[in-house]
């Protein structure tokens, strides 16, 4: 089987990671104790168990154990996961934690405190990987604004890549926003992390607290959304994005196939996820949605989990995952209509850049749903926002002594800043590129070659 090792780091990473395990355990019929309860229909049972090995190991007495590693620099988060409803699901040796915490300092997570803990984490990752028949890759949930998730999370990514250079690395990264800020130095932590992710990951889903809050206020009409509400939205998206990996299907059935379809240039692997229909926790969707409504909602800027407007950029590639009993023909027609009506929002130099998959099993409580993964040049808005905040502080060298005190060099900040600005320019370059530009690029290349 094509197994995935899941790693969750830091408080945010552990909270969204645990919520993800709750939701997929429910979809696969796995109880909080790890036991499988037989599906009502035999067909459903086969679908639930056919690819269960992608995320679970089968333990003794027929129990299923998540192939997960839970990491934090302080024990608090682990205690709350253990005490939670699904705490019994994880093996005790999957928890790796320090005692100190990293006090919102990226350098502590990446160079000092985190570096001391990283070997114990790699041991657990190694053990889990060795038990796999055919490991396809790793997925990491973390936030970029905190410390353990950003500093230690990116350290883990680079260490794992050293050992498993040919496996796929996917991250679900929560990007900080000024509206929902825990600490002043979030722009520093995020910029230093993105500097690492650009080079070291194959796919990064950008989840944005600002977008999640907007969805809670505008769409779900929640007056005081909690982190629980935000995590609920994230876990819906994660469940949707991983549907093709967990259930039998043809399209994007493993991480590498998804990467090949979605990433036209290696650095441009930051995706904008979306979900439809959006529902609040605990509420049931009473009105059944039609496929046209789902498709419309899915492409709507208000449904995006990253705070950027796709209408300000162009889609390089798109993957859509529909779930529930529906007509494939209708899905294809609707997707075709969207592309035709909005052709200016899709780059014309990648033909067939929208891929659609359909899975029969809908999420709990819904008749049908759709998950959207877009590689859009509009994601540069998100990087610009972080970059502006970074520059404002870095120009005054504010808070820098906390980082240099842990052995970091100012040069690393300058490099991270310019790498992020380069990323923004690359997105801009491909946003403006047209199919006719190709000939010009080739001619330039030939001329340069002559002068070499």
From Swiss-Prot:
Record: residues binding Mg(2+): 74
Subunit-structure text: Dimer of alpha and beta chains. A typical microtubule is a hollow water-filled tube with an outer diameter of 25 nm and an inner diameter of 15 nM. Alpha-beta heterodimers associate head-to-tail to form protofilaments running lengthwise along the microtubule wall with the beta-tubulin subunit facing the microtubule plus end conferring a structural polarity. Microtubules usually have 13 protofilaments but different protofilament numbers can be found in some organisms and specialized cells.
Pfam families referenced in this protein's UniProt entry, alphabetically: Tubulin, Tubulin_C
Job of this protein: Tubulin is the major constituent of microtubules, a cylinder consisting of laterally associated linear protofilaments composed of alpha- and beta-tubulin heterodimers. Microtubules grow by the addition of GTP-tubulin dimers to the microtubule end, where a stabilizing cap forms. Below the cap, tubulin dimers are in GDP-bound state, owing to GTPase activity of alpha-tubulin.
Disulfide bonds: none
Molecular function terms, GO-annotated: GTP binding; GTPase activity; metal ion binding; structural constituent of cytoskeleton
Keyword Magnesium among record annotations: yes
Binding site for GTP: 11, 74, 143, 147-149, 209, 231
Protein name listed in UniProt: Tubulin beta-2 chain
Similarity comment: family membership: Belongs to the tubulin family.
CC annotations in GO: cytoplasm; microtubule
Annotated Acidic residues bias: 434-452
Region (Disordered): 431-452
Cofactor(s) the record lists: Mg(2+)
